[in-house]
Amino acid sequence: MSDYYCWGQEVYSPCDGIVVGAEDGYAENEKTNLLADMSNAYKNAHYFDPEKDDIQSVAGNYVIIKYSENVYAALCHLQTGSIQVSVGQMIKKGEVIGRVGHSGNSFAPHLHFQLMDSSDISVANGVPCAFEQYEIFRDNEWQIIENGIPTDKDRIRFW
């Protein structure tokens, strides 16, 4: 996993809030296996049943933060044993919550981040996410964007 630049990097809380979900201890995937991971992704996308299936098989180790009424942040696929927060804990934006991992239904080490309208990740709907600042590659140069929402076609970066 150490060949992946993000694996083991610290993950920071994107907002002030209260931790309403934190699950650790789900086994880290030992290697990447594209065919097996694609098969799992297909199975989870089409046949996942929240009544009988474990959400950790999809999300791996995760933290859910309540930001405001009906807005929750989920940070998933965290490294096993790295979560540093617990349910009920008030946290501040920028506080370390864990490390990037390769747990759950993950093609390779990465951080899955989403805003959603419920603390239950298995039934929540997505909420648009605005970033305070990022850069977009446009007209052959990087341009700073403040308080924007990138589109699915934008090439962006953070620093």
What are these regions (language model features)?
Residues I18-L78:
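Zn2+-dependent peptidoglycan hydrolase active-site motif and core
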Residues Y5-W7, V58-A59, I83-Q84:
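Short, small/polar residue-rich loop motifs at catalytic or cofactor-binding pockets
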Residues M1-E28, R138-W159:
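Polar/charged, compositionally biased leader and regulatory segments
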